[in-house]
C-alpha cells in the first residue's frame, strides 16, 4: 500500500528528549526509521515541529534525514481544539525564521523538484509565524479533510472549535459528504480566519494554485541561483533592521 510513515522527532537527541519527555526517544525513533529504510519501505521520514527550543537543530536534522534518503517534514506551533492548546507561541520569531531560511536554501540547492516546492512550504511557515494571511486560499472540507480517531470527518485539525461533517461509523461516504451538516461546516470553513499553514491544508492548495508556488520556485531556483533571503519579506524589515 502507498503508506507514508513519519515519526515526530523534535531535534537532535538532547533537544528531542527534552521536548518530548520520552527517555531515549530520539534513538528509538531514529532506529525505527532506519529499520524501515533497511526493509525497503519507500516513504519514511522525520516530522519536526519547529519552535524556539529546537530551531537550531532544524538543518542538522535535515542533513541526517537527507543522508539516509528519508523524507523531512516540517511544521511549526499551532493552537487548536485538536491539539488542546491555546497558548502555543514563538517568542523569538527572527531566530526561528533565520533557521527556516537556512533550510530553504538547502532545499533550493538540491536537485529535487519536490524539495524546491518544500522550500516554498517552509517560506509559508515563516509567513505564518509572523501572523500574516496565508499565502494560498484554504479549501479544506472541499478538496481535503481530516478523519479523527473516532471516525468523525472534520475539515482539518487546526480550527478553534471542532466542526464535524459526519461520522463514518454511522453514514456512508456519499451520505456524509453531501449532507446538510457538511454544507454547514463548509460555510464555517469559508469564514475561518486562522490562517494556519500545515501540510494537510497547504499541500492541496499548492496543487490547486500550482502557478503561485511554481513561479516562486522558478524565481528562486533559476533566476536567483537557488538563493532565498528573509529580506525579501517586507513584513520582516523591522526585525532585520533591529538585529
Regions found by a protein language model. Name each.
Residues 1, 13, 20-23, 66, ...:
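Generic secondary-structure transition motif, activating predominantly at the C-termini of alpha-helices
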Residues 3-10, 14-154, 158-167, 209, ...:
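Radical SAM enzyme [4Fe-4S]-AdoMet core and its adjacent flexible, acidic
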Residues 135, 157-243:
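Flexible mid-to-C-terminal extensions adjoining Fe-S/redox cofactors in radical SAM and related proteins
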Amino acid at each position: 500500500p502507498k503508506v507514508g510513515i513519519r515519526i515526530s522527532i523534535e531535534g537532535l537527541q538532547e533537544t528531542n528528549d527534552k521536548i518530548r519527555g520520552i527517555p531515549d526517544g530520539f534513538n528509538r525513533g531514529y532506529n525505527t526509521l532506519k529499520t524501515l529504510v533497511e526493509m525497503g519501505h519507500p516513504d519514511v521520514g522525520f516530522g519536526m515541529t519547529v519552535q524556539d527550543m529546537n530551531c537550531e537543530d532544524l538543518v542538522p536534522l535535515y542533513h541526517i534525514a537527507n543522508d539516509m534518503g528519508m523524507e523531512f517534514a516540517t511544521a511549526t506551533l499551532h493552537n487548536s481544539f485538536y491539539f488542546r492548546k491555546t497558548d502555543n507561541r514563538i517568542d523569538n520569531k527572527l531566530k526561528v525564521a533565520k533557521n527556516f531560511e537556512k533550510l530553504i536554501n538547502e532545499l533550493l540547492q538540491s536537485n529535487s523538484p519536490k524539495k524546491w516546492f518544500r522550500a516554498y512550504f517552509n517560506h509559508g511557515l515563516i509567513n505564518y509565524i509572523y501572523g500574516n494571511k496565508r499565502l494560498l486560499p484554504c479549501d479544506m472540507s472541499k478538496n481535503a479533510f481530516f478523519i479523527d480517531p473516532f471516525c468523525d470527518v472534520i475539515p482539518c485539525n487546526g480550527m478553534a472549535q471542532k466542526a464535524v461533517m459526519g461520522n463514518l461509523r454511522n453514514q456512508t461516504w456519499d451520505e456524509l459528504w453531501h449532507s446538510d451538516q457538511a454544507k454547514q461546516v463548509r460555510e464555517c470553513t469559508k469564514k475561518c480566519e486562522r490562517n494556519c499553514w500545515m501540510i494537510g491544508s497547504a499541500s492541496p492548495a499548492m496543487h490547486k494554485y500550482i502557478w503561485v508556488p511554481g513561479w516562486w520556485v522558478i524565481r528562486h531556483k533559476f533566476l536567483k541561483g537557488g538563493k532565498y533571503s528573509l529580506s525579501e519579506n517586507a513584513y520582516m524589515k523591522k526585525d532585520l533592521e533591529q538585529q
